[in-house]
Every structure is written in structure tokens, then in C-alpha cells.
């Protein structure tokens, strides 16, 4: 029986060894699977984090670009309004100056006309006086006319 016992014990030892080996292989496979899953989770987490960071950067860039665009439009509009206002005021000032110049010219024209009329009347009066003086000097005057222009005490 010894050989049978030895054979039995050897079979038992072999069975236990196989069982332990299978357990160890199972444990190693479980640990390898867990490590694989953990690595996949870490990779997915890193991928998600990278994607989120990229999306946040994209949104921030879009917001910054939109803010710059809005600011540029506001500045452009303000500049346009300022230019229109300045142009309007310049036109208004030019119109006022033109009207003032027109009024000044009209006043000068009126003054010149009045001055020329007065000068003409004075020259006419002086010429008439000179004519009358010459006529009287040469005795060519009518006595009735002389009374009006050269009153004397001849009554």
C-alpha cells in the first residue's frame, strides 16, 4: 500500500499544486484585468479632461474674439457718430458764416448804395451851384430864378 499511498499522495499534491497554480493564475488574471480597466479609466479620464480643457479654451477664445468684435463695433460706431456730429457742426458753422458773410455783403452793398446816392446828390448840388454862379457871373440868369438861389434885398 505504500506505493498506492504514495501515488495517492502524489496525486493529491499534484491536485493541490494545480489548484494553487490555477488560483494564482486566476488572481494574476484578475489583477491584470483590474490594472487594464484602471489604465483604461485613467486614459478615459485624461481624454475627458483634455477634451474639457480644449472646449473651455475654445469657448474662452470665442468669447474673447466676440468681445473684441463688439468693442471694435462700438468704437467704430462712436467714431462714426463723432465724425457725423463734427461734420454737422462744421456745416452748421459754415452755413452761419455764409449767412453772416451774405448779411455783411448786403449791408456793405446797402451802405455803398446810400453813400453813392449821397455823393451823387452832393455832386449834383455842387454842379448846380457852380452852374448858377457861372450864369450869374455872365448875367445869364433869370431874375425869378435868382431870387430862389441868390436872395438879395431888391424888392
UniProtKB/Swiss-Prot annotation:
Q: In which tissues is it expressed?
A: Highest expression is found in seeds. No expression detected in adult tissues.
Q: Which UniProt keywords apply?
A: Repeat
Query: Region annotation 2 X 11 AA approximate tandem repeats of T-A-Q-A-A-K-E-K-T-Q-Q: residue ranges?
Result: 53-74
Q: Which domain of life is it from?
A: Eukaryota
Q: What induces it?
A: Up-regulated in response to water stress.
Segments of skewed composition (Basic and acidic residues): 11-21, 28-39, 79-95, 144-155
**Where are the compositionally biased (Low complexity) regions?**
40-78
Q: Region annotation Disordered: residue ranges?
A: 1-155
Q: What is this protein called?
A: Late embryogenesis abundant protein 2
Species of origin reads Cicer arietinum (Chickpea)
Amino acid at each position: 500500500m505504500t506505493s498506492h499511498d504514495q501515488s495517492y499522495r502524489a496525486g493529491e499534491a499534484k491536485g493541490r499544486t494545480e489548484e494553487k497554480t490555477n488560483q494564482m493564475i486566476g488572481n494574476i488574471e484578475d489583477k491584470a484585468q483590474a490594472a487594464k480597466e484602471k489604465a483604461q479609466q485613467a486614459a478615459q479620464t485624461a481624454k475627458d479632461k483634455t477634451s474639457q480643457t480644449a472646449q473651455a479654451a475654445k469657448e474662452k477664445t470665442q468669447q474673447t474674439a466676440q468681445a473684441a468684435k463688439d468693442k471694435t463695433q462700438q468704437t467704430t460706431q462712436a467714431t462714426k457718430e463723432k465724425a457725423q456730429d463734427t461734420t454737422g457742426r462744421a456745416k452748421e458753422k459754415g452755413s452761419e458764416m455764409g449767412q453772416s458773410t451774405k448779411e455783411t455783403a448786403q449791408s456793405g452793398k446797402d451802405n455803398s448804395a446810400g453813400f453813392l446816392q449821397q455823393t451823387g446828390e452832393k455832386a449834383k448840388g455842387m454842379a448846380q451851384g457852380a452852374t448858377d454862379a457861372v450864369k450869374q457871373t455872365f448875367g445869364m440868369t433869370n431874375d425869378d430864378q435868382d431870387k430862389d438861389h441868390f436872395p438879395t434885398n431888391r424888392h
